[in-house]
Amino acid sequence: MTPSSITTYYVVDAFTSVPFAGNAAGVMVCGGGETGDTCLGPLARPDDPATLPIMQQVAAEVNLSETAFTWKAAGSAEYAIRYFTPTVEIALCGHATLAAAKVLWGRGAVPSSEAIVFRTGVGGQELRCALEGGRIKMVFPDDQLDAVEGEEKAELLSAFGWSGDVRVLGAYKGRLNQDYLLAVPEEVFSRLDRCLNMQKIQEVNEKYGVRGVIVTARAGGREVADGGVAVDIKSRFFCPNAGIPEDPVTGSSFPTLAAFYKMSKFVGLQDHPRRKGVVRVERLEESGQTAISGDAIIVSRNEWLV
């Protein structure tokens, strides 16, 4: 890019109704120009190989857990989307998709009465976002779980410093995103920070081709978050192999949580120590899908000059 091709990018706090909570995502709208700004040259097309190192450099400079890049496709509300952490491109990111939808509606690129269809750059998955009841709703395919056993399970538990004296309620791997899910009692969940070993978690994830590890416990509606919302389950998500030791709110992990808990509806709190977020989940059994919804706030608008 050159100084003559100034591009606006945004920072959005996703899965929260208050600023400086939830998960912050960068959003860069490329090749659209609905409000007069443009993203030409090497970022004009999502399928141009020259875009990859540039997008990676931008994501590293923005230095949020994920940055989303979007391009207007055929149809008034269809967009290509790609996601980058500061170190690597990833196939899917729920909170960055939520953030991108918030930006496109907010800047008038798509009327708020219309749904937005995103097509991911890796894997070609289609994600539909719509405004319902003031929140952004996304629909994912249902996940399916496989039990993790034997040596793989032992290595995974060891990465958290757990041995036979810690009661683990279940160890699974989701097929949708290749995430581990560890279900534990609430008292074990509350002590997670005492036993984390990010180097070992990264080694296990890389050895077995896993994106990240979900650790979850029931909350039973006793906890309240984000302005008085009663919470049913809690979770945390660890993905050091993607350059993110712990992701604050991981929307794409909730279909995996839904497959484990098997509740028709629930409210999940992703309980990051510094940035908590709330995700509402509904299983759409007739269509074999899982819907997640949440709030989002645009906290800054910036100009990319180089």
Describe each model-derived feature in a short phrase.
Residues T2-L92, L98-V306:
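Active-site proximal loop and beta-alpha junction motif in alpha/beta enzyme cores
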